[in-house]
A protein has these predicted regions:
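Cleavable N-terminal export/targeting peptides
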Residues: 1-32, 272
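Transmembrane beta-barrel domains of Gram-negative outer membranes and organellar outer membranes
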Residues: 28-272
């Protein structure tokens, strides 16, 4: 099962992005720094397919390694001259250690967000909308069998000529039932981000994913990472690609939570 899951994870980038690679426009009108800042805007007018791999070290009671590959297609849709809807879907492919020394591999729960955002924003940009957790997990060790729903909000500042891009994305998801495997849940995600862009598409970045499990005891509730990394825009033929590598240390975590996370991301970009 593990080999099949890993083979699927490695094959998906080619399956999803192959048709675009063959016919992607040059986008010569956008420089590397502009492309980098566009990639850093969660509600930008940009079709993209990020593949984000998170390796969590010293996870679980046996302090083993957990790996999560998030496949995260982003699709903006124009609904009028003034408004866009930006859909963001996260499908996790998980390799999870089990307490008995075994390991399970498969798909976790899908998280879908639809942001309503101004089509012509100023320096300060925002988007708001619902977030839905869909129980797509392939087994009970990788997710919850109850649907979830909640609000999501993103705000950021992005100005032409300014190397800084910063903001935050927050959501909270409540389970709609407690009857399925895993029971009810109430989880928050807070992702502040800050980027400093250099000429040529090189940038420094920090985007820790802070989480809170409101149903856990207070001492086990929060995961708070600190860290950062580096990113670069390059091209595969005519296709812009955003590559990023970063590391985060959890200064606060549950007893069974990991202490380090290594994040590697490749984002295929299709600017409109």
């Amino acid at each position: 099962m593990m080999m099949k899951t890993r083979a699927l994870a490695w094959a998906l980038p080619g399956v999803l992005c192959g048709p675009f690679l063959l016919g992607a426009p040059a986008h010569a009108e956008l420089g590397a720094e502009e492309l980098a800042k566009l990639a850093q805007n969660p509600v930008g007018n940009l079709v993209s397919v990020p593949f984000q791999n998170n390796t969590n070290l010293n996870f679980g009671p046996d302090r083993r390694t957990q790996n999560i590959l998030n496949i995260q297609p982003v699709i903006p849709v124009s609904v009028s001259e003034d408004w866009n809807i930006i859909t963001r879907t996260i499908v996790p492919v998980i390799s999870q250690p089990l307490p008995d020394g075994e390991r399970t591999d498969g798909i976790g729960d899908t998280v879908f967000t639809a942001f309503l955002s101004p089509a012509k924003p100023g320096h300060f940009i925002w988007g708001a909308g619902p977030v839905v957790q869909v129980p797509t997990n392939s087994n009970s060790d990788l997710g919850n069998r109850n649907w979830g729903l909640g609000p999501s909000l993103v705000v950021l500042r992005l100005e032409k000529g300014d190397p800084w891009v910063y903001g935050a994305l927050v959501n909270n998801i409540w389970s709609l039932s407690d009857s399925g495997t895993g029971g009810s849940y109430n989880n928050a995600t807070i992702q502040p981000f800050i980027n400093y862009n250099f000429a040529g598409g090189l940038y420094l970045t920090s985007s820790p994913v802070i989480t809170a499990n409101w149903k856990a005891e207070s001492s086990q509730r929060w995961t708070v990472p600190v860290g950062g990394g580096i990113g670069k825009i390059f091209h595969l033929g005519k296709l812009p690609v955003n590559a990023q590598l970063s590391a985060y240390y959890n200064v606060v975590a549950p007893d069974d939570g990991p202490n380090w996370q290594i994040r590697a991301q490749v984002q295929f970009m299709f600017p409109k």
